[in-house]
From Swiss-Prot:
PANTHER family: INNER MEMBRANE PROTEIN YEBZ. It is found in: Cell inner membrane. This is Copper resistance protein D. Belongs to the CopD family.
């Protein structure tokens, strides 16, 4: 089994960068005007600053861990020279440098959110998207060559972006649904509008996740299912698909049942119970998303071909 610490760092990095990208993107397509200013609806500045800085720290730990594993070094300090060599002499190192630059840029840009909220969120979403895309170089696509490599990377990056968009929206709704945030009519109206507005964006995101996920499966495993479920990779993949199905089911319940009920309750001025129902549903969906990210981090360290040959 892969080093649990490496899997944990991968999981933390996936979660952090998806939150950075997805939360900034949510502010662009769901909020309006002054609502994009930190503190008006969501705490953009402290939250995105923290995720950018944590992303920098996790990236440093990640590259040293990879160098330690590849070099066979027994001590952390012994792995540092190997990490420096990886950064300066490999494609993975180039992707890592791009990620670090993007995260520094995001940390600087979000500081201007109170002055230029829309521009700052736009820049953070772009830089966060670049940082998130670099994780593709730590996945299975890095082992391909030629045109296959290009298309595998494209599918990987699309999967990362669409997953980040969904995860960021879930985090945003979780923050907006906190009990102290649904006390005023204005905040409840913003919540109702963003829930309704996310219906179309959510459908597009799910479509991209399914499309890119199928393409990734074909690149990694091929057009077959027999034998895959007998491996650790297959079991984890089935778990991921089951959790994804649960998330789609909860999202459908939110769209077709809970959100319309909440909107009607807002018009009547009786929204406490409806908000509580959506809060529980979103908490389950966010919890499932976190588990999915954990499985993604683990799956990225496994090779179904190698397991099949064992």
């Amino acid at each position: 089994m892969e080093d649990p610490l490496s899997i944990a760092v991968r999981f933390a990095l996936y979660t952090d960068l998806m939150m950075l990208f997805g939360l900034a993107l949510f502010g662009l397509y769901s909020l309006r005007g002054a609502e994009r200013r930190s503190g008006a609806v969501l705490p953009f500045r402290p939250l995105l600053s923290a995720t950018a800085l944590i992303g920098l720290l996790l990236s440093v730990v990640s590259i040293v861990l990879m160098a330690k594993a590849m070099s066979g070094a027994s001590e952390w300090l012994e792995a540092v020279p190997h990490a420096e060599m990886m950064v300066t002499q490999t494609e993975l190192g180039t992707a890592w440098l791009i990620r670090m630059a993007a995260l520094v840029g995001a940390a600087v840009t979000i500081a201007f959110n109170l002055r230029v909220p829309m521009a700052s969120l736009l820049m953070v979403s772009l830089l966060g998207g670049v940082a998130l895309a670099t994780l593709a170089w730590t996945g299975h696509g890095a082992m391909d060559e030629g045109s296959r490599r290009f298309w595998h990377f494209s599918a990987d990056i699309l999967h990362l972006w669409s997953s980040g968009g969904w995860f960021g929206a879930l985090v945003a709704f979780a923050l907006m649904l906190r009990p102290n945030k649904v006390e005023t009519l204005q905040s409840v109206q913003v919540l109702s509008r963003t829930l309704s507005g996310f219906e179309r964006a959510g459908a597009v995101i799910v479509a991209f996740i399914v499309l890119s996920g199928v393409v990734n499966y074909l690149f990694i495993v091929g057009p077959q299912v027999s034998g895959v479920v007998e491996s650790t990779y297959g079991v984890l993949l089935l778990g991921k698909l089951a959790l994804f199905g649960l998330m789609v089911g909860l999202a459908s319940a939110n769209r077709f049942v809970l959100s319309p009920a909440f909107e009607r309750a807002v018009h009547r001025g009786e929204y406490a119970r409806a908000a509580r129902s959506i809060r529980y549903s979103m908490a389950l969906e966010l919890g499932a998303a976190v588990l999915v990210l954990g499985l993604i981090a683990w799956l990225g360290t496994l090779s179904p071909e190698m397991e099949a040959g064992m």
